[in-house]
A protein has these predicted regions:
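Extracellular beta-strand solenoid repeats
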Residues: 137, 144, 150, 159, ...
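Right-handed parallel beta-helix
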Residues: 155, 227, 233-262, 266-267, 272, 301-312, 337-348, 359-374, ...
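A short, hydrophobic/aromatic-rich structural module that often spans a beta strand
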Residues: 275-299, 322-337, 353-370, 418-422, ...
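C-terminal, active-site-flanking charged/polar segments
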Residues: 439-443, 448, 461-523
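Extracellular "leader-to-stem" segments immediately downstream of a signal peptide or signal-anchor
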Residues: 18-319, 492-563
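Bacterial N-terminal signal peptides that target proteins for export
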Residues: 2-14
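Glycine-rich beta-solenoid repeat tracts in large extracellular/virion proteins
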Residues: 148-152, 165-194, 293-298, 317-320, ...
Length: 563
């Protein structure tokens, strides 16, 4: 492959003794003009770390070069817009949401009709100033479902009285292939819906770096502050070919890998627009460039799922080849924003909590996955906390897994940013990380488990290729790591505890940027510090527990599961 693995050295790059071919040649790089696209403080000190706290208590960012370049022109992006209402906003208190429908458990029979009817009754009520309609409360006890519960309207909250075995337990008898216990939202195209007047315009920059928040376009006429826009990265044959990331041999095509990232315009200056959140994947003219257009998505919002235990069929087998005798997925979110899942435990399923297209600005917290079913080591089984589709700006925090395969996992072409914060996996049998096909902009912040890998998966599956780029492992503790650098992109690991290893598929790929290996860094949480920098200490208090602010909470996560 005709590129040079030359990266800018940023801080003390700690590597273990592996074959020399696994690691890049590091050299000082020249600053690039693209640095004008950033709004965050730049640390120009020689060998500066990727991210560090400055003397003023705010983060400073060193620029780095992507694989194949010697130009330090990219920045670790700000992930802090992830979560409900764009991060830093408390979820609505339970007491502030009126209970409209109350159901008691039945001794026997199918509870689906009456629960769905209660949801539908709340769905037609008038929304309040917050966009909320009210809650359906399922009293403590056991409920049975013959079909998938669905929430299709904004402002509906489905609430129980606890996620433990003595709380509100919903047992699903759905047995359709890929069946779900609870479906929230709906399907949506991976291409964001264009506005009536989209004002599509080409990006007028040779290179839009990772971390950029300003983009110059051919014409910004008609763009206004507050517009929702899609940044389209439109690769060409060169990008998937030998001069690029060399994945055409895995049956990747340019049209399949156009990726759309939604942002909000915060300023317009001539033909330069400022965005509310940074770019997660560089856009280069030589690899196809990109465009911008105004969007008008149709999604629901202000939906809450809380204080429940969702269960599949405990009789479903656990060995490879198990047939679909119970629901496959517990909960799936799509075409939904500014919503939440809190204090929910799932049990006896394959997949736990899953997003799909259109899931944005959602928080899933204090959630757990127990006693999985379906194939113990079989492919496409036991994905626990899964970002799929064009999901972006989602936060999963304080999550716990026991027995899954892929715990903190990303599907194909997920644009990000998305965050896992303060999460623990126990007994996971395979790796966490991006699973396939160029997902970008994921932060694994204080996760703990078995393996955490960002690598070229080559022909695995149906041609997984490069699984992910711009994946940040921050103060994580896993037994084994793989941190490879994709061509013309990068992956990072800072403060990791655990052994680094060559990739499973092509071990010869050069490593990404690894700093402070074996020694955790300050700040403890990148997400929370970025949030603090952007919105202040109260924003951090709004979205965390006191124990979380004091330090690591892994040891306490299992206690809240409600076994």
């Amino acid at each position: 492959m005709p590129f040079l693995p030359a990266f800018r050295r940023v801080a003390a790059l700690t590597l273990v003794a592996l074959p020399a071919c696994l690691f890049p040649t590091l050299s000082a790089a020249k600053p690039a003009s693209e640095t004008g696209a950033f709004i965050h403080p730049i640390n120009n000190a020689e060998d500066a770390p990727l991210v560090e706290l400055g003397s003023n208590g705010l983060l400073r960012y060193a620029l780095y070069s992507e694989r194949g370049s010697d130009h330090a022109r990219n920045m670790v992006p700000d992930f802090s817009r992830a979560g409900y209402q764009g991060g830093g906003v408390s979820l609505p208190t339970r007491s502030s949401i009126p209970v409209i429908e109350v159901l008691e458990p039945n001794a026997e029979g199918d509870d689906y009709p009456r629960i769905q009817a209660a949801i539908d009754a709340v769905a037609v009520r008038v929304q309040d100033s917050r966009g909320l309609r009210g809650a359906v409360l399922l009293r403590r006890g056991r409920y049975r479902l013959s079909k998938t519960l669905t929430i299709r309207a904004s402002g509906v909250v489905l609430r129980g009285e606890g996620r433990g075995a003595d709380g509100t337990v919903i047992r699903s008898e759905v047995s359709d292939r890929q069946g779900r216990i609870l479906e929230v939202g709906s399907s949506e195209s991976a291409v964001p819906r264009a506005a009536l007047d989209p004002r599509r315009t080409a990006i007028n920059m040779d290179y839009v770096p990772v971390g950029a928040m300003l983009i110059t376009v051919k014409s910004a006429a008609g763009y206004r502050v507050g517009d929702t826009v899609s940044i389209a990265r439109e690769p060409n044959a060169r990008w998937v070919g030998p001069e690029g990331i060399d994945t055409a041999r895995y049956r990747w095509t340019p049209s399949d890998y156009a990726v759309y990232s939604e942002r909000v315009v915060t300023a317009v200056d001539h033909d330069t627009i400022t965005l509310d959140a940074p770019i997660m994947d560089a856009i280069a003219t030589r690899f196809g460039g990109g465009s911008v257009y105004r969007t008008d998505p149709i999604r629901i919002s202000q939906v809450g799922i809380e204080d429940l235990r969702l269960e599949g069929n405990p009789e479903t087998g656990t060995v490879n080849g198990t047939t679909d005798s119970g629901p496959f997925t517990a909960l799936r979110l799509g075409a939904i924003y500014n919503s939440w899942v809190r204090d929910v435990t799932v049990r006896y399923v394959s997949h736990g909590f899953v997003t799909r297209n259109g899931a944005q600005f959602n928080t899933l917290q204090d959630i757990a996955y127990l006693d999985p079913r379906y194939g113990e080591t079989q492919g496409a089984r036991r994905y626990v906390f899964l970002y799929e589709g064009n999901a972006a700006f989602n936060l999963i925090q304080r999550c716990y897994n026991q027995g899954g395969r892929h715990t903190f996992v990303i599907g194909a072409r997920v644009p990000g940013p998305n965050v896992f914060l303060d999460c623990l996996a126990v007994g996971d049998s395979n790796d966490s990380g991006p699973h396939h096909r160029w997902s970008t902009g994921t932060l694994y912040d204080n996760t703990k488990g078995y393996m955490l890998r960002a690598q070229n998966r080559r022909y695995s599956g149906t041609g997984h290729g490069w699984a992910g780029a711009q994946q940040m492992f921050w103060n994580t503790e896993h037994d084994i790591y793989v941190v490879q650098a994709p061509p013309f992109a990068m992956n990072w690991s800072v403060g990791q505890v655990g052994a680094i290893a060559p990739g499973k598929f092509p071990p010869e790929e050069p490593a990404g940027i690894v700093q402070s290996m074996g020694q955790m860094v300050t700040p403890r949480s990148l997400y929370l510090q970025q949030l603090r920098d952007r919105l202040g200490e109260q924003a951090v208090i709004n979205v965390t527990t006191e124990a979380q602010r004091d330090g690591r909470i892994w040891d306490s996560l299992a206690a809240g599961v409600g076994e």
